[in-house]
Amino acid sequence: KKVMIQSTRFPGIEMDNQVLDRFYGYGYDRKVSNKMNFDLNLTQKLDFITKGLSIDLKGSYNTDYSYVKTVRGHIETYTPYYKSEVDGSNLAKDDPAFDKTVVYRIAGQNMMKTYGEGNKSRARDWYAEASIRYNREFGDHSVGALLLYNQSKKYYPKQFADVPTAYVGLVGRVTYDYKSKYMAEFNIGYNGSENFAPDKRFGTFPAGSIGYIITEEDFFPKNRFLTYLKIRGSVGLVGNDNMSSNRFLYLPDSYSINDSGWLQQSYSDKNGYIFGMTNTAYMAAARELALGNPNVTWETALKQNYGIDAYFFDDRLKLTADYFRENRRDILMLRTSIPSLISMNGLLKPVNIGKVNNHGYEIDLKWSDRIKDFSYYINGNISYSKNKIIFQDEVEPNEPYMWRTGNEVGARFGFVAQGFYDVDDFNADGTLRADLPQPQGNKKPGDVKCADLNGDNVIDSDDVTKIGNPKRPAYTFGLNFGGEYKGFFASMNWTGVAQCDMLMSNAYMRPFFGSQVLYQYMADGRW
């Protein structure tokens, strides 16, 4: 196959400009992957010891390795010319002796030029679990118990790829049920994470729940209006060891030896401290890079949930409602109230000091029915959730409206816009009138005008306040419905959110920066 270039002036020569032709001789990429997944599940009943007793063993092993083999080639290219253009005759094209025989000059050669391997990825993990279970009924009473041990390890994580992540846990649970009316459950978890120092590595997390089905009581009249009513509640403590990119914060302080970046500029080619005035000498030295935090531990959350389940009209209308609260403590964050001089220029590690409370509700209502061969359902739901920062080691601001503590996580803070500057706001020489609050930067007519909240006639950081809601919506709505008729099914889903704010895209922000202009279509319908 010949690859032609520069042949546009030769209409009779076929052009190699097809999409696939452009890749001819370029080479290829070959992805090689190898995956293996192994799962094991064994159950042994121990009824010969006592009825309802059993043991379970579970395990899994997964491995994945892939790489891309790259081969890049070089090809011959053929450039067409008229013979008289390359034979040295130097004849003009209008000369009768000009030879228009098409000849080709060849450049390069067909060969595979480079080889390589890249984009390597690897993954490996295993999980092991052993449990002993007991479930048995004694007349109207049902009891259950579980004792479970699990352990897992994941290799090649994104951070510290040579150090796998490891977890170990012990779980205990007991359950009780009386006549399917009264239900209770208690469980406790004892979990360990390699993210913490040995004396902080394990955490204990208890939880309990109760339920009461009122419609199972003898005194509750059987009727078609309310066919099922259950009230329930739960409370529990959970732990979180997900530290994102902050693994091993508990390790001792780290140091750098002979770092020249902290010397005077005139001695930037030296390492260490400079001694002397005339016969100067430098000594090798070390400095702290980061301070360890041996007290880093689990982030905890005390969660509560209270709800009801109710069915009406022969179970055609179903209602589920929940109210929840969550008090999250020991959130890992940086301390901001410590001066940088004391805190080693920001080298302090995050500590477990953050506190956030959250509360909300969820309501789900569904109607379903069948009319001969046609069945249908209508389902609507709404959820509300709002959090509040209780503590985040915030430095006391100059103005009370600047506090971020007490607001939602992720609340939008900024300047309050009050329209745009007009030509009447400026003097004849283009400077801003002195009776107006003085902003930072060189403002021009059309720029955004910001509010002077503290009345000091200056627009600065002391005028920053909450201007919007977090990105995460406080309200989430849903409506879905569908129907089925003799094997034909159709459905539709609607979703919506409220009390959330998104930042404008760059296309809408750009006109307000630098020397950009605001187009009329962007201004129409605003303010």
What positions do the PLM features span?
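Catalytic-site beta-strand/loop segments enriched in glycine and acidic/polar residues
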Residues: 145-153, 183-192, 449-472
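A structural signal for short, well-ordered beta-strand segments and their strand-loop junctions
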Residues: 56-58, 75, 491-493
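Glycine-rich, aromatic-lined ligand/substrate-binding cores of catalytic
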Residues: 51, 470-503
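Short helix/loop capping segments that flank catalytic or ligand/cofactor-binding pockets
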Residues: 65-68, 242-243, 424, 491-493, ...
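Extracellular/periplasmic, surface-exposed regions of secreted and cell-surface proteins
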Residues: 1-5, 10-72, 81-414, 486
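Short Gly/aromatic-enriched secondary-structure transition segments
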Residues: 72-75, 335-336, 394-396, 495-498, ...
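Conserved small-residue
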Residues: 247-263, 370-471, 502, 509-527
